[in-house]
Regions:
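Generic detection of intrinsically disordered/low-complexity segments and helix-coil linkers/edges
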Residues: 35, 120, 125-126, 297, ...
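Flexible beta-edge/linker motif
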Residues: 105-124, 246, 253
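Soluble, acidic/polar mature domains that operate outside membranes
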Residues: 127-135
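Solvent-exposed beta-strand/coil patches in large extracellular/periplasmic or lumenal scaffold regions
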Residues: 1-15, 19-86, 91-93, 134-344, ...
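Surface-exposed, gly/pro-biased binding rims or lids
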Residues: 344-387
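N-terminal accessory interaction module
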Residues: 92-102
């Protein structure tokens, strides 16, 4: 907490007692941090802001804060607040609630007799990037996130937003959201909008035999991923997400599925495909084409989120040109990732033998792999990872290829997303180091102890 000095005017002459009919308070909030959890808004300490309001005490003991204003650098909140005898908010009205250059809204709130705070928000535009950043940090899906908010809060919230702004110049229009929390726990969520003003997106909290399941469906997966700052290199496709919100107190489990999409201009993918073993299998021209754009038919990514970490469990992606598997962890607290996987050139032909009983399992290996596969690892800093490729694995079929797997640092059967997939600010380009591509030199590296 940060101490804030209040300056008062309106003292009655000669008595030294407050004139409760019109006391004015002014404060400098520059060094204070302000939070509005319902909208993912935060004013950081150090950002200029001034507070002023007029205190009007009512005969019954309640208080109105009239002409309530918080103004400063890129910030303007104007309206009034009503308090009960215990100085708890009973209602507020902010006809103007704007911050930055992209958020322009009005907010009304009323505490009902049952203690539920009913909030209504409307506006032409809302900058949702801070909200999505908190969501992608994974702990916002877990019970541990409640410690940062009001655990006992009971909220009914509805919002209508003309244009919701996300990362990479992406946006959604005609956004409608209804949300209910009881005791700080999400119990109802319905949201819908149009990605880029065209393709529908829908989010819903469903009841599945007593468990809460969060579902999301988007008819433009690429725009949806860019909107929330998840992954910028995916184009097109349809996406579906299911998250079991009651899987555990700390972690949540889910599955992401995407169909009929392309990956375009991903620098980490280009690094993986730059290995000479890829040239030998794909041919130089197809290798260069794949670096620029790869078409996929299907992605399936089971995951576990919690404790500041995001784990992928035997995720796979496949298409006519290329397939891949991924296992490992992204640690948002340490800003590091550690993943391992196998990419499969000429996936459609390469995996055809998988249909042969017994022999197919031996030759192809895990789901999503093929007869010819090349193991790789992506490790290090989340913003600038290092790519390692093991060319010896191309000569080893199926289940025996696991001998050459890089150690992902997790128990067998867990894995991660990669490179630019998660966590970075998708609006910021960072200088990139050239990835170090090299074969394994010894058994120590083969075990992933590099």
């Amino acid at each position: 907490s940060t101490p804030v000095t209040l300056y008062l005017s309106g003292l009655s002459k000669g008595t030294g007692q407050p004139d409760t009919s019109g006391m004015t308070m002014v404060a400098d909030l520059t060094n204070a941090q302000l939070l509005f959890h319902a909208f993912g808004w935060k004013k950081p300490a150090g950002q200029d802001a001034k507070l002023s309001f007029v205190v009007n005490k009512k005969p019954g003991g309640s208080t109105d804060l009239d002409n309530f204003q918080i103004e400063g650098e890129g910030l303007a909140i104007l309206g009034r607040i009503a308090l009960d005898n215990d100085n708890e908010i009973t209602s507020l009205s902010f006809p103007k609630f704007s911050f930055g250059t992209l958020t322009d809204m009005s907010i009304e709130a009323l505490r009902r007799d049952d203690g539920v705070m009913q909030i209504r928000a409307e506006g032409a535009s809302y900058d949702a990037r801070d909200f999505f950043h908190k969501l992608i940090s994974t702990d916002q899906l877990t019970e541990s996130a409640k410690a940062e908010t009001d655990d006992a809060t009971n909220i009914d919230l509805t919002a209508k937003i003309g244009r919701l702004v996300g990362y990479d110049n992406s946006y959604a229009t005609d956004v409608d959201v209804s949300l209910t929390k009881r005791g700080g726990e999400l119990v109802v969520l319905n949201g819908r909008g149009l990605l880029s003003g065209q393709k529908p997106i829908k989010v819903e909290l469903q009841d599945n035999n007593g468990s809460r399941v969060l579902t999301a469906n988007a008819d433009d997966a690429g725009t949806a991923f860019r909107l929330i700052g998840f992954y910028r290199s995916l184009q097109g496709g349809t996406a579906s997400l299911r998250v079991n919100m009651d899987a555990g107190a700390v972690t949540k489990t889910g599955t992401l599925r995407v169909r009929d999409f392309a990956v375009v201009g991903d620098a980490v993918v280009a690094d993986v495909l730059s290995d000479p073993s890829s040239t030998a299998v794909l041919g130089q021209q197809q290798q260069q084409d794949a670096k620029r754009k790869i078409v996929f038919r299907r992605l399936r990514a089971p995951f576990i989120a919690g404790g500041g970490k995001f784990q992928l469990d035997d995720a796979y992606v496949n298409g006519p040109e290329l397939g891949a598997t991924l296992r490992g962890t992204i640690d948002f607290n340490k800003r590091k990732l550690d993943l391992g996987g196998t990419y499969v050139p000429l996936y459609g032909l390469n995996s055809a033998l998988g249909a042969v009983p017994v022999l197919g399992r031996v030759l192809v290996g895990r789901q999503g792999e093929g007869v010819v596969g090349i193991t790789f690892a992506i490790k290090g800093k989340l913003d600038d990872p290092t790519v390692l490729v093991n060319p010896m694995s191309v000569m080893t079929p199926g289940i025996f290829r696991q001998i050459f797997d890089f150690n992902s640092g997790l128990p067998q059967g867990t894995a991660t997303g990669a490179g630019e997939i998660l966590g970075g600010n998708a609006d910021t380009e960072r200088p990139r180091k050239k990835r170090r591509l090299r074969p394994l030199q010894n058994a120590r590296e083969r075990r992933g102890l590099n």
